[in-house]
Amino acid sequence: MDKATIKAHKINEQEYEEILKILGREPNLLELGIFSAMWSEHCSYKSSKKYLNGFPTKAPWVIQGPGENAGVIDVGGGVAAVFKMESHNHPSFIEPFQGAATGVGGILRDVFTMGARVVANMNSLRFGEVCGDSENARKQRYLLKGAVAGIGHYGNCMGIPTVGGETTFDASFNGNILVNAFALGLVKSDEIFYGKAEGIGNPVIYVGSKTGRDGLGGAVMASDSFSDANKSLRPTVQVGDPFAEKLLMEACLELFKKDYIVGIQDMGAAGLTSSSFEMAGRSGSGMKMQLDRVPMREEGMSPYELMLSESQERMLICAKKGCEQKVLEIFKKWDLDAEVIGEVTDSGQMQLYWHGELVGQIPIKPLSEAAPVLDRPTARPKYLDEIKNLQIPKDIDNKTAFLKLLRESEILNKALIYDQYDANIQTNTIKQPGYLGAAVIRIKETGKALAMAAQCDPRANFVGPKIGAARAVAAAGRKVAMSGAMPLAITDCLNYGNPQNPEVMWQFAQGCEGIKEACRELNTPVVSGNVSLYNDTDGVSVYPTPAIVSVGVNDDARANLKSVFGSAGTAIYLLGETKGEFAASLYVKALFDVVGGTLSEIDYKKERALWELVIAANKAGVLEFANSVGVGGVAMSLAKMACISGIGAECKFDVAQANFIFDESFSRALVGVTSEAKFSELAAKFGVKFEKIGVTGGDKFRLNEIDENLKEISEIYFNEFANIIKQED
């Protein structure tokens, strides 16, 4: 094998030597391509696995933790929730519509392959600077429009509601946008399917769309940095067909009602290669496949192309022997391709045939369960010492600061984005996008509700990689709790830069430690997730972005707690302590273009007590609304609540310094109290500090010296984002 071919497959010298040992010979091109895909960062997690192993993954309600297509938790009444989040960052930067659309398609397959009907989508999106007339700003607006359109197109065509998410902007994402997709499905607790291929002689069946050449090398592409030399990568981006996926989902759900199969696996990154190796690897078995039987969309396709294509809307099934015809009939009924292409063996080898000739043979274990694990060097970034002491350069009056922060893209209403998503299809949505806090859907079969919230502050993770990641877990859980639901588990999508940079690996290692700590202390285990590395262009990495989605259960769907004002005359209480913390805050970034400071540690007892107080007070019927205090502090949280509800507020907030109304002290919430005596008793019981700061009502927004007309600030809040993004329209 010549060095140029090996290099083109991103295989280094050490890895190639290992391949020679495993095979006892030189690999052919097909085998080299398979090693390249399965040992890529995207498939093998070789740089990250060392740090993921310590994640808390168990609890009485966890049915399936990491290692399967998606995580599963028991949500009561014989129902389980199946959920996961994944990235499609690199494809979305190259071709935003198809990249984002197929990201949605892939995460949907991960969920419904477990036997669940998908009932909710969410997303976590990061773009660069969108304001202004620079070439970069125009490109970022183009990327945003394309990615959002792709997400909406796929989810809407599938008939699955997109119920929430988060979108933020920062210059660190100018060279790499982040598109993280989340999906959640429901299944009976005793009807879950797994991705395994066992039982000697059991048939292996290919189902779904035909295989084409789209997406070739996608897993390897997603395991590399961008540079000027590799930006013509459109052929590596998959092309999605949501209508084909809808048929595939319905066919699979029909199949799951029968007793015909042993296991099923989505063909995602690395296509037929990853699905076959993963299924056999989990079961410790072998597999034979006749590649000439794979349904092909294009003429003249080679075994290499068939194994590594990432054409969408495809699954691999291990059926029970004798049930082949029944499986095929179901998929033919739904007008999908279905062919028996192989069988399970006890060889521990993947044997690949082409018109009867053996064209590839590789041991399965070294490419699945025993793939290489790297121990990359780490180094604490030098910049941390340079930014740790935050100095606010000068005083700015609060009215000026308020109007400046209100116009920030992070704060502005994102109706331009979420209006492209159908949030109400399936008629289960209780709280949809645009109303702050967690998204909430009902479980019709049980009368319960599921709350889910996406959260991550990249600036905080840049300033303090460990505490920032822990805060993402805690803040996502707090949003869920503010709806009245108890947070039960999380899924993560860990977006970092180039792992070959020791400072990036240090950020990643610290982020994992923060997640471990927060999940352990808050009793919200990790049940699924994804790692996306190489979010780096020309040596510049994105801010560390460990995106978290927390999922919780409210035993009574009718007792969902609003996040915005519900009526005039309700007392507004602030829960938690305001300490004047501006590290990584929007205040210093927006006003002074500074990102720095030192984050304070999380007091997990106080965080958990805040959750439990709000949940208990909601059950007691003494709350009208609850909203987590986040970016922009009390001032921005209150302003958004007023604008969305159309109800003003009269607030007086005792602070040590005037600008503390914008501080981002952690573990705080704003609640509307309908019985002050009863609420005071509960707050004392849970040991949560509280302060009455005002009352809802009127057509003004007043907070200390800020005195604004509600209609005027609402026009800014609701219209300014569209004005920014639609400049070229």
Swiss-Prot record:
<keyword id="KW-0436">Ligase</keyword>
<dbReference type="InterPro" id="IPR010918">
    <property type="entry name" value="PurM-like_C_dom"/>
</dbReference>
<protein>
    <recommendedName>
        <fullName>Phosphoribosylformylglycinamidine synthase subunit PurL</fullName>
        <ecNumber>6.3.5.3</ecNumber>
    </recommendedName>
</protein>
<comment type="subunit">
    <text>Monomer. Part of the FGAM synthase complex composed of 1 PurL, 1 PurQ and 2 PurS subunits.</text>
</comment>
<keyword id="KW-0547">Nucleotide-binding</keyword>
<keyword id="KW-0067">ATP-binding</keyword>
<feature type="binding site">
    <location>
        <position position="86"/>
    </location>
    <ligand>
        <name>Mg(2+) 1</name>
    </ligand>
</feature>
<comment type="pathway">
    <text>Purine metabolism; IMP biosynthesis via de novo pathway; 5-amino-1-(5-phospho-D-ribosyl)imidazole from N(2)-formyl-N(1)-(5-phospho-D-ribosyl)glycinamide: step 1/2.</text>
</comment>
<feature type="active site">
    <location>
        <position position="42"/>
    </location>
</feature>
<dbReference type="InterPro" id="IPR036921">
    <property type="entry name" value="PurM-like_N_sf"/>
</dbReference>
<comment type="similarity">
    <text>Belongs to the FGAMS family.</text>
</comment>
<feature type="binding site">
    <location>
        <position position="266"/>
    </location>
    <ligand>
        <name>Mg(2+) 2</name>
    </ligand>
</feature>
<dbReference type="InterPro" id="IPR010074">
    <property type="entry name" value="PRibForGlyAmidine_synth_PurL"/>
</dbReference>
<dbReference type="InterPro" id="IPR041609">
    <property type="entry name" value="PurL_linker"/>
</dbReference>
<dbReference type="InterPro" id="IPR016188">
    <property type="entry name" value="PurM-like_N"/>
</dbReference>
<dbReference type="GO" id="GO:0004642">
    <property type="term" value="F:phosphoribosylformylglycinamidine synthase activity"/>
</dbReference>
<feature type="binding site">
    <location>
        <position position="110"/>
    </location>
    <ligand>
        <name>Mg(2+) 2</name>
    </ligand>
</feature>
<dbReference type="GO" id="GO:0005737">
    <property type="term" value="C:cytoplasm"/>
</dbReference>
<dbReference type="InterPro" id="IPR036676">
    <property type="entry name" value="PurM-like_C_sf"/>
</dbReference>
<keyword id="KW-0460">Magnesium</keyword>
<dbReference type="GO" id="GO:0000287">
    <property type="term" value="F:magnesium ion binding"/>
</dbReference>
<dbReference type="GO" id="GO:0006189">
    <property type="term" value="P:'de novo' IMP biosynthetic process"/>
</dbReference>
<dbReference type="Pfam" id="PF00586">
    <property type="entry name" value="AIRS"/>
</dbReference>
<feature type="binding site">
    <location>
        <position position="529"/>
    </location>
    <ligand>
        <name>ATP</name>
    </ligand>
</feature>
<feature type="binding site">
    <location>
        <begin position="87"/>
        <end position="90"/>
    </location>
    <ligand>
        <name>substrate</name>
    </ligand>
</feature>
<feature type="binding site">
    <location>
        <position position="45"/>
    </location>
    <ligand>
        <name>ATP</name>
    </ligand>
</feature>
<feature type="binding site">
    <location>
        <position position="530"/>
    </location>
    <ligand>
        <name>Mg(2+) 1</name>
    </ligand>
</feature>
<feature type="binding site">
    <location>
        <position position="84"/>
    </location>
    <ligand>
        <name>ATP</name>
    </ligand>
</feature>
<feature type="binding site">
    <location>
        <position position="532"/>
    </location>
    <ligand>
        <name>substrate</name>
    </ligand>
</feature>
<feature type="binding site">
    <location>
        <begin position="310"/>
        <end position="312"/>
    </location>
    <ligand>
        <name>substrate</name>
    </ligand>
</feature>
<dbReference type="Pfam" id="PF18072">
    <property type="entry name" value="FGAR-AT_linker"/>
</dbReference>
<keyword id="KW-0658">Purine biosynthesis</keyword>
<feature type="active site" description="Proton acceptor">
    <location>
        <position position="88"/>
    </location>
</feature>
<feature type="binding site">
    <location>
        <position position="492"/>
    </location>
    <ligand>
        <name>ATP</name>
    </ligand>
</feature>
<feature type="binding site">
    <location>
        <position position="109"/>
    </location>
    <ligand>
        <name>substrate</name>
    </ligand>
</feature>
<keyword id="KW-0479">Metal-binding</keyword>
<keyword id="KW-0963">Cytoplasm</keyword>
<dbReference type="GO" id="GO:0005524">
    <property type="term" value="F:ATP binding"/>
</dbReference>
<comment type="function">
    <text>Part of the phosphoribosylformylglycinamidine synthase complex involved in the purines biosynthetic pathway. Catalyzes the ATP-dependent conversion of formylglycinamide ribonucleotide (FGAR) and glutamine to yield formylglycinamidine ribonucleotide (FGAM) and glutamate. The FGAM synthase complex is composed of three subunits. PurQ produces an ammonia molecule by converting glutamine to glutamate. PurL transfers the ammonia molecule to FGAR to form FGAM in an ATP-dependent manner.</text>
</comment>
<dbReference type="Pfam" id="PF02769">
    <property type="entry name" value="AIRS_C"/>
</dbReference>
<feature type="binding site">
    <location>
        <position position="238"/>
    </location>
    <ligand>
        <name>substrate</name>
    </ligand>
</feature>
